[in-house]
Amino acid sequence: MGFLIIDGNSILNRAFYGIRVLTNSRGVATNAVTGFMNTLLMLEKDVNPDMIAVAFDLKAPTFRHKMYDGYKANRKGMPEDLAQQLPYMKKIITAMGITIIEKEGFEADDIIGTVSAACADKKIPCTVSTGDRDSFQLVNDYVTVRLAKTKGDIYYTPDVIMEEYGVTPKQMIEVKALMGDSSDNIPGVPGIGEKTALSLIKEFASVDGVYENIGSTLITKGVRTKLENGKESCYMSRQLAEICLTAPIDTELSHYVPKERDDNELARLLSELEMYKMLQKLKLHPTSAPAGSKEALEESAAKQIPAMPAGDIVLTQEGNVYAGAVGAPVKLSDVELKAYADSDSTKYTFDIKETLTVTGCERLKNNRFDTTLAAYLADPDSNDYSLSRLCAQYGVPEGNSIQEKSITVAALNDILNCKISETGSAAVLTDIEIPLATVLVAMEREGVSIDADGIKAFGKQVCEKAEKISREIYEYAGYEFNIGSPKQLGSVLFEKLALPSAKKTKTGYSTNADVLESLMDKHPIVPLITEYRALTKLQNTYVTGLLKVVGEDGRIHSTFKQTETRTGRISSAEPNIQNIPVRTPLGREMRRFFTAKDGYLLVDADYSQIELRVLAHISGDEIMKKAFLDGVDIHTVTASQVFNQPLEWVTPDLRSKAKAVNFGIVYGIGAFSLSKDIGVSVPKASEYIRSYLSKYSGIAHYMEQTVAKAKRDGYVETMFGRRRYIKELAAKNKNLQAFGERVAKNTPIQGTAADIIKIAMIKVYNRLEESGLDARLILQVHDELIVEAKEDCAKKVALLLKEEMENAVKLTVPMTVDVNIGKTWYDTH
């Protein structure tokens, strides 16, 4: 109820800096608009206002600039990616039926102040939404400031301000006059900080009161001198800090009742920005793309392409399976399901993996198309392939009944089939993704046996070691504290032990991994803290985390996700098998608790340097190809090339550095990241990269050509036709462009490697099924596959794995696989 006034610039800025960069396919940034709209919808729901307005600053100088030339002089200009979103934001707000208030010569704060004062005069409740504490001075019995915070907004009333600061809202002006405000370049009294300013105002009520009592014994000599020297600055700062309550704007509050929403304009704007989730939230459908655009051509092609061949639409709903002709699917009983799954009927699924999970079937014969997987291939940047999301994205009515939804899915299939056929990725769907779903579901059902007692005992050891280290940390600190608290840890490191630090921020000192790494040789407490963190993470994330997901059968059944990554790699959850730590000896111990059941062994097959072999193949670099063809260690060869040493002179340290350079090139990291990885200066890391690219000229040429082609086409592809669009290449922001170039370089390599792993999984699964061997594929972790096999056939399975994986695809260099057998995952390494 009441009036909601939003500080437009403040909320938009918070969204821009608080949300990772999002762009549409034309490179227009959308993160600020996305964040603002989410905030707006939340505010409308929470506050339910009768009247609403959004206040914005204008570029023109205000009366404060005329009063003080230095006002906000330290502010940098608005970032280009934010500036390009501002016009969109204002148009969207207007289309929402909300009034925007701007006034030349006045700031948004003054507009907010004037509106809130008008509300208070009329005894109408007013909520001010802002990320700026300057508005605290406006708070009274009718005006509440809702301060935007990451972990939940905070409501400031007179009582809350008194409790937090010990002063009244109006006295916040006096406090700011004394302490100044570095963000607005308000000088205040030099040398007076917030703590002193608050104590002075608590005692003397105002700036006038402070100067009237300048000789008081309650004011120390040092503070008195600062006050005397800074009196003129203090009074000027007070004028700058006080929000105007009489800005020349319309204060007839009834004029701010929201107008009817312009859904057509709103849909047009959000469609142009490709904000499909927001369209869905607002229950709007995308509009047609602008004539002549890439999107319009695709839409035109979609309309001309004939519908897909007749077949059954297969849907799941509330644990039931429905199948049948478009518009007429029927519910299948358990008995009917089994027969139907093995039938020759042409089937079109919506989320084949979910369908197999619900049905309990091992596979779905003659499944020709899957809507979810096709949508993933068409738009791998999305993180939502639900039916409602796809309907919003492609402008298809969703329907309510299962019969209507089958019509919806058929329409989506026609659109998506057109898209992936045009892009050449249809074969990725039919030959890789759909067959892979069968493999993933089988792996999830099988699970992997876990030694729960062993994990518990290991966890106890980890806790004991962490406890021992914590005692050593307390000895160095001189007292006990919460090591897990960045605030308390910062106090110990930078105040008690006086270690060098970056400047203290409002939230305290930074104690992140980079900071600790820079302090590693400054005090013996630092390596102990790093080790303590590693141990507590191991305990909390992996030991406790694994025990939580062990099923009644003594096995964990991880969920393998097929549509999560942009490169095509498989990810997993509950638990995330891909993240089981392997870099430290203690972390590697975790593998001991992944074990084969009684009478069985684990057979582990791991591709050797698959991404570098893919790089050699697609770049055609002769030196790298020769190394793989000759069976020479590629990292030793790279060390020889980069560091100009004969092969026999390459030391383990040089090989280690060369390995980091090799994989740094694959993952597209720059000199800064490489320097941190191998412990050298940034210039030295740059030198290594230049040397690498000069020696491996084929790779350098490939990188240049790939980036140039990606800039021209807007996308890159894997060897098999999986496409990834790189919107960042069209961005105006240089950092975004650089990121886009790195993605262009590494996606074809990583994506091709991911496709090869998937092809290998399908081949291994099918071969095991055909062989009759008592063995099941149970895990995929990065570049390795793990099979649980009966002891008497483990060696046969090892040969089968090696044969299928090494021959999954043909490259110009050999793919080699290391195969090991053991009772536990640890034993296979």
Tell me what each language-model feature is:
Residues F3-L4, G8, R14-A53, D69-G70, ...:
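Conserved RNase H-like, two-metal-ion catalytic cores of nucleic-acid enzymes
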Residues T23-N24, A73-I249:
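Extended two-metal-dependent nuclease catalytic cores across DNA- and RNA-processing enzymes
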Residues T99, G152-K176, S183, G319-L440, ...:
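Active-site-proximal helix-loop-helix substrate-binding element of RNase H-like nuclease domains
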Residues G230-E336, S343-I352, I402-I580, L601, ...:
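Conserved "right-hand" nucleotidyltransferase catalytic core of DNA-directed polymerases
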Residues T372-G399, Q403, T408, Q562-L647:
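Function-dense linear segments that define catalytic or interfacial modules
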Residues I420-I432, L436, I756, A760-V781, ...:
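Active-site palm subdomain of RNA-directed nucleic acid polymerases
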Residues R445, H557-S558, Q562-T565, S640-L773, ...:
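Conserved catalytic core of nucleic-acid polymerases
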Residues E467-R471, E475-P527, S694-R742, N746-P748, ...:
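C-terminal polymerase-core module
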